[in-house]
């Protein structure tokens, strides 16, 4: 190996050694609401001003911002002409940091550090035993989810953030898929946030949010959304279209086939369809700019769910065909997930 190649390899190895720091510091910036502060100011902010806003040491905030600017999260800029702090360092938003505000993916980033213990990481034990580290009984719930702050705030906000971003992409890039659709069932729709966004964007839809009885019992009324309790392994309310958003990646292939069969029973054979919104991994690992995130999500599912996984085109085709659908189409919606249309 040439000296230059060896030096690059060593640098890359060091970067992996400190790889966890990037996510940790991004999470810290979100906790301090730095992206929101910069967004609200609408102009570059000096380190002293930022330190005052977040009630932290200016030196420490500078070092954090220097690190994040190196990684392209924020950008260092020149002082604005009207500045009275000529010697201060200024930082501004980037397209990435705008995606880290509270109204974007900020809440999802806040989830990450909390899931490292006991069962949020892929470890040697995970790979050898197919069990989550720190969880003794497969039927035992993760103690993390028993924490009301985590389950009712951190986890719920993260899932809502993810669903909000993906639903916005569906509305923007898959609007034609809802033309001529009268009724739509959102299976596993929780409290109906995603469905309410779709009904607002496509007001001709009659939305049915279908989830476990104990979930829909806690849901607040939403315009254009009817809540129905039940289990997707038994039966699903009939509609023109059945939607599964972030559902099938939680389950084994066998369970997915059973869920899809129930979905198939709920739609018309002539005009109905099932919409699956989940990640589709490219066979050769290339793909688009979201491939790294999809692969990351897949190994996260391996750590947090016993049978959860993201699937390739071939793997999706296998379970869709086995469930009895005659054809399916995969559509790119310019985000982490794709839309898969399955026709009975």
From Swiss-Prot:
Annotated positions binding S-adenosyl-L-methionine: 211
Catalytic activity: apigenin + S-adenosyl-L-methionine = genkwanin + S-adenosyl-L-homocysteine + H(+); luteolin + S-adenosyl-L-methionine = luteolin 7-methyl ether + S-adenosyl-L-homocysteine + H(+); quercetin + S-adenosyl-L-methionine = rhamnetin + S-adenosyl-L-homocysteine + H(+); (2S)-naringenin + S-adenosyl-L-methionine = (2S)-sakuranetin + S-adenosyl-L-homocysteine + H(+)
Known EC number: 2.1.1.-, 2.1.1.232
MF annotations from Gene Ontology: O-methyltransferase activity; protein dimerization activity
Organism: Mentha piperita
Active site per UniProt: 249 (proton acceptor)
Protein name: Flavonoid 7-O-methyltransferase 1A
Any single biological process term in GO: methylation
Subunit structure: Homodimer.
Uppermost EC category: transferase
Function: Flavonoid 7-O-methyltransferase involved in the biosynthesis of polymethoxylated flavonoids natural products such as pebrellin, aroma compounds which contribute to the flavor of peppermint, and exhibit pharmacological activities such as anti-allergic, anti-oxidant, antibacterial, anti-proliferative, and anti-inflammatory effects.
PROSITE patterns documented for this protein: SAM_OMT_II (PS51683)
Pathway(s) this gene product operates in, as recorded in its UniProt entry: Flavonoid metabolism
Matches recorded under InterPro entries: COMT-like (IPR016461), O_MeTrfase_dom (IPR001077), Plant_O-MeTrfase_dimerisation (IPR012967), SAM-dependent_MTases_sf (IPR029063), WH-like_DNA-bd_sf (IPR036388), WH_DNA-bd_sf (IPR036390)
Assigned keywords, A-Z: Methyltransferase, S-adenosyl-L-methionine, Transferase
Family named by the database record: Belongs to the class I-like SAM-binding methyltransferase superfamily. Cation-independent O-methyltransferase family.
A family per Pfam: Dimerisation
């Amino acid at each position: 190996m040439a000296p230059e190649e060896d030096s690059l390899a060593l640098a890359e190895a060091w970067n992996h050694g400190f790889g966890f720091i990037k996510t940790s510091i991004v999470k810290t910036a979100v906790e301090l609401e730095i992206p929101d502060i910069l967004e609200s100011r609408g102009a570059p902010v000096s380190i002293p001003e930022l330190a005052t806003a977040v009630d932290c040491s200016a030196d420490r905030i500078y070092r954090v911002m220097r690190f994040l600017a190196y990684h392209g999260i924020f950008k260092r800029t020149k002082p604005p002409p009207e500045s009275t702090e000529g010697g201060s360092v200024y930082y501004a938003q980037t397209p990435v940091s705008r995606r880290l505000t509270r109204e974007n993916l900020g809440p999802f980033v806040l989830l990450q550090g909390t899931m490292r213990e006991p069962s949020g990481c892929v470890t040697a034990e995970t790979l050898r035993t197919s069990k989550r580290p720190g969880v003794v009984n497969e039927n035992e719930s993760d103690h993390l989810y028993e924490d009301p702050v985590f389950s009712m705030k951190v986890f719920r906000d993260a899932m809502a953030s993810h669903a909000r971003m993906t639903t916005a992409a569906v509305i923007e890039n898959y609007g034609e898929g809802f033309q001529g659709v009268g009724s739509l069932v959102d299976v596993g729709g929780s409290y109906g946030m995603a469905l309410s966004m779709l009904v607002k964007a496509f007001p001709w839809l009659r939305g049915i949010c279908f989830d476990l009885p104990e979930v829909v019992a806690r849901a607040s009324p939403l315009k254009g959304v009817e809540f129905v309790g039940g289990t997707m392994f038994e039966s699903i309310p009939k509609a023109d279209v059945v939607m599964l958003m972030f559902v099938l990646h939680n389950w084994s292939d066998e369970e997915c086939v059973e869920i899809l069969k129930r979905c198939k029973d709920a739609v018309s054979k002539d005009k109905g369809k099932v919409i699956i919104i989940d990640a589709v991994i490219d066979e050769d690992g290339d793909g688009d700019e979201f491939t790294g995130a999809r692969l990351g999500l897949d190994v996260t599912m391996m750590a947090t769910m016993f049978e959860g996984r993201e699937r390739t085109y071939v793997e999706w085709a296998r379970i869709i065909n086995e469930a009895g659908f005659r054809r399916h189409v995969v559509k790119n919606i310019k985000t982490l997930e794709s839309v898969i249309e399955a026709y009975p």
